[in-house]
Structure formats: structure tokens, C-alpha cells
Amino acid sequence: LNKENGQSFIENLGLAMEDIYTNQRELLEQATLQDRRKAFQFAYLSLLQEENIQANHQITPDSIGLILGFLVQRFLEHKKEMHIVDIASGAGHLSAAVKEVLSDKTIMHHLIEVDPVLSRVSVHLANFLEIPFDVYPQDAIMPLPLEEADVVIGDFPIGYYPLDERSREMKLGFEEGHSYSHH
């Protein structure tokens, strides 16, 4: 696909998921949430061999999602419904792994991601997994359009902060070029 449309492998992975949940419903309905999430993870990790990606486009490892899911389950075991905010959500893999652990709960996921490519991929992932994600394509350090959250999770990015003008206002921002997001 990337030779046909000139988009990156990550963007085309989103388009491939869109095709599956739009045109191949029978295939999708045969798979469990875990099967679909692992298929996404495998495809994402496979594309890393094809394309050099920036560090902040890497997905959160399963172990982090499973541990966070376990902690949320232990601390909020009395809640049947909850709002989870994922700060710097990337492609949404962390929220998907947490949902897998909390499968018996009704969760409204609010994903905050400044990178437009990753925001779009997380929308496709939500549809592919059939998990309700509200994706906010904005900077997590700006005021959030949320009124409530029971839990805030996040796997903070390593790499470049994409908003050069905003980073120049920060103490650790570079005067020229991209600043690091992890400073």
C-alpha cells in the first residue's frame, strides 16, 4: 500500500484495519479481543522491520499494559464503570491492553495524543477492537476537554516533541529544531 499511496507503513496499518472492520466483518467477529490486539501488535512490530520510525511511534509493551490493568483492577475493584484517561496515548495499544485485563468493566477510554498520525491509528484500532475510545488529537499539557477521570494512565514518549512553537516557550525547549519530548 505505501508504494501505491505514498503513506507510511503505520498510516497504512490504520487503513488496513479500517478495511477489515468495514469490509470483512465476518473475519473480525471470529476473533477475540485478545486475538485482534495481538494481530495489531504483530503487524505493528513487523512494520518496524520495514520502516525506520521515530522513537515516540513505538507501541507500549504488553507487560506495562497488563501491570497497569492489574493495578487499576485492584484499586478500583468496587467500580463497575470507569473513565480512564491515557495521556500521550500513541497508537492506543496501552489502553487496549488495559481494557483486555478489565474486560468485565464498562470503560470509557479518553486518549490524548498530539501526533496526528498516531491519533488516526488509535481511532482505527478502537474500531478494529470494537472498544470505545474518545481520541483527542491535542497536546496533553494543554487544558483537556474532560470533566472526570477515575484513572490516568500513560507511557510517556521518548523522542521529539512535535510542536516546535510550543516547545520554544518551555525551559528545556530548543531554540531551533525539535525539542525532546522526554525532558
Go through the PLM ranges and name each one.
Residues L1, S8, Q138-I141, H183:
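Secondary-structure junction/capping motif
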Residues L1-V101:
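Class I S-adenosyl-L-methionine
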Residues S8, T32, T60, D104, ...:
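Serine/threonine-rich low-complexity intrinsically disordered regions
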Residues Y21, Y44, F75, Y136, ...:
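Sequence-level detector for tyrosine residue identity
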Residues N56, F75, E100, L125, ...:
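Generic preference for flexible, low-structure residues
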Residues I64-G65, G69-G154, G159:
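Conserved S-adenosyl-L-methionine
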Residues D155-H183:
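Mobile active-site "lid"/loop adjacent to the S-adenosyl-L-methionine
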